[in-house]
Amino acid sequence: MGTATFSEAVLKNLIQHDYNIVQVVSQPDRRVGRKKELKMPEVKVVALEHDIPVFQPQRIKDDYQAIIDMQPDLIITAAYGQMIPQEVLDCPRLGCINVHASLLPKYRGGAPVHYAILNGDEKTGVTIMYMVKKMDAGNIIYQKETPISNDETVGELYDRLSILGAEAIIEAMPAIIEGTNESIPQDESKVTYSPVISREQEKIDFNKPAVEVYNHVRGLNPWPGAYTTYQGKTVKIYQGLVHNCP
């Protein structure tokens, strides 16, 4: 289950390692761009290339029977974008697992890659975890770390974490299937959140220290893009440089 590039990488790796994918669930096709052309989610494109059935409910909480009817042994989600109903979580005999782009319990939520750079973190990673009703709160199965360079953008880090997540799920799968994996509860005292970036957050505050402004710019590059205003017009800024003034 997934929609974005992150889930595309996971699906491709599962296919390459000969796992039997009985169904792919993604968000509906969306109209994008000035011409409002209908675009399929990346994960759907991969599924169709490999003759895998695709299910695209508008709202999964109201339309999930097709998933249960497949009687899956295991459900894997990666950047799906909707909360999964309990009926689906209870369906597979091996459980539902999620590939999350942070080192949980840090950065639960929908924008973990953005916040890692916005906050100037020196490392991040991916987490394979069991899914529960509460968002990103399940037991941790497997984690994989990676450093963050001080000039990396959110787009660049997202691409790297997509690959890392695809590697991590393959490394974790044998123990999950055999039932020999050991999962550990998350430390609730260390939980932080990464809510979706709001329009207000996109605006640059030049009263902040230069390093924070720099992190803000690269933490929103290429999407949604940091901005300021100049002569009454909105100006997007995608690059910055910190100078050490004498």
State where each predicted segment sits.
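One-carbon transfer enzymes
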Residues: 1-224
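C-terminal active-site/capping subdomain that shapes the small-molecule cofactor and substrate pocket
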Residues: 208, 214-246
